[in-house]
Amino acid sequence: MERESEKLSIRDPMMDDTKNTDDSTNNKHKKIIIIAVICAVVIVALGLTLFFVLRDDSDEEKKDDSIPECPQCGLSMDELKQRTDPKYLGTIKLLESDSPEYAALDQKDKEALKYIVKAATYLENIEFQIDDSYNIPFKKYLEEQIQKNNEQAKLTKILFDAQKGINALDSLSHEINLAKGHKTKPGIGVYPEDLTAEEYQRILIKMLKENKTEEVRNITNQRSMVFRDGEYLKAVDYVEYFKEDFTKIADELDKAAEYSTDANFTEYLKLQSKALRTADPMLDAYADKKWAELEYTPLELTITRENYEDTITSSYSNNQELIDLLSAKNITPVPKDCLGFRVGIVNKEGTDFLLRIKQFLPELAKNMPYSDEYEQDVTNGTIKQTMVDADLIILAGDVGAYRAGITLAENLPNDDKPSLTIGGGRRNVYHRQIRASNATQVQKKLDLILDQEQHQYYDTEADHWFTIGHENCHSLGPNILESRLGQYRSIVEENKADMGGLAFTNNLTNLGYYTEEQRKKIIVTVVVDNFLKVKPDLSQAHRVRTVMQNYYLKQHGAYTITEDGKIHVNIEEVVPAAYDMLKEIIRIQLDNKFEKAEEYVNKYFIWTDEMKIIGDKLQTLSATLNSRVENELADKILSEY
């Protein structure tokens, strides 16, 4: 300030002293004013700067609130937008509220249906936990994030609902993990997360040597949840562990039984309700036995129990010391069941056609390879097999999880279920809405991959005809309760059903079940549909067996690839090749040795150049990576519950 004062005091030297004094005073006033103005300008400038900074921060905060990140979500926004786009995410529609099938139901059965559909939601809650212990916490997390307008969580939830869980494989066999850092566990949600197959085997060996026989029996059955118990493991029956939800299901089934118009279906509801209240596998057996007798009931209800996902339990089959110890204690390990809940309306016309095959099953049983070495469920005296065609209302839990696909039909109960030991049979349920197809898309597929002269023999309905043979062949052949095929058990069994269904096409034509035209359509359609987009993962039993069959049929001249890269089926070569493969499969099951099953799968699970040529074409035809199921009727029923 001193230099500034000096500068401001310089004046004309000709002025007198008085004037200089006045000017000096005035200069001081001016100085004060100028300083005040400068300070004011600085303050205003700082204020404006602060205002705009705060406004920018506020805008940034608003931006973050409208599109927040989802820290626990495993897929980026770009990938989520792609996978949830209709081009990549297909839709399967089940029965709608205005469907004639629903309208035709008796009012009492509609009332019963209300409680059955509600029961499905409780079972899905159980299966979420069996599938992965993190499913429900992650689902709740997504729902909380969606309430905060989190778009990433919203799109993730669409995929979660479609695949019914965090982890799944898409149609290109890519593993999809919706939660960040989360992977599929070998013991799914029924074993401790950190338990490996090797540790599992060591613990069981230790427990058996210490005579903890019953504990091991409980750990290795198909219906228990397993936990650590110090240096050991312990098990709790899932009916006991999920008692609250199972009781809710039982309560709903009891209510439904009060309204059901069909006496047999009502009896089944009561038996199933009883089985869900007490941890006793024999109660399930009585319910399953009754269920397997149901044919022309108005309503369809199945609690599905199948064991494809758990690889911890089946790992015992390649540990000879453990095998010997288990055999000495008469313990047969069975992989853990995953649970599903199917609800529908029985379609009479479709069921009529299905049941026509029943009379021919004893003849097919006679023609099974090595039939003199084992007993079969299907004999001349008794046919413990029935089947229904169902219009679907809801698929909850495991049966409704779209993980690279949803099954066209199911043949239950499986060999490990106790109902088969008390005279119970099996029942096939076929899914009408799942087998629906798009005619335009089918034609594009044929133009792309099938020799023009054979287009006439490709028919999507032939998939259904073939599936009838496939499902019934599950009931043919040896019933191996103590399967030692490990992770190859399901691959071998599904292969048996496929090759049996194909091998007996000629027999069923000669017996009058199929027409000659249907025979040709089944053969061509099955061979064409054996071509996949990509080589599947070994965990995908249904797809692995498809590659194996494709390779085997090619080696036996059942088809060729034309110069322009299209499939030509050598129709009359297919059935003999299928029967030869069926013979190999049955021998693997009868020998019941892990090493032979492994060798067999590795021998034929080969992705050839021909498969890649067709697979690449199929990828250009459809971009669909996953699909979701819409159940409008079920949603409406639940909204009015």
Each predicted region: which residue ranges?
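Short, hydrophobic alpha-helical membrane anchors of single-pass surface/secreted proteins
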Residues: 29-38
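Extended, compositionally biased alpha-helical segments that mediate assembly or anchoring
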Residues: 378, 586-641
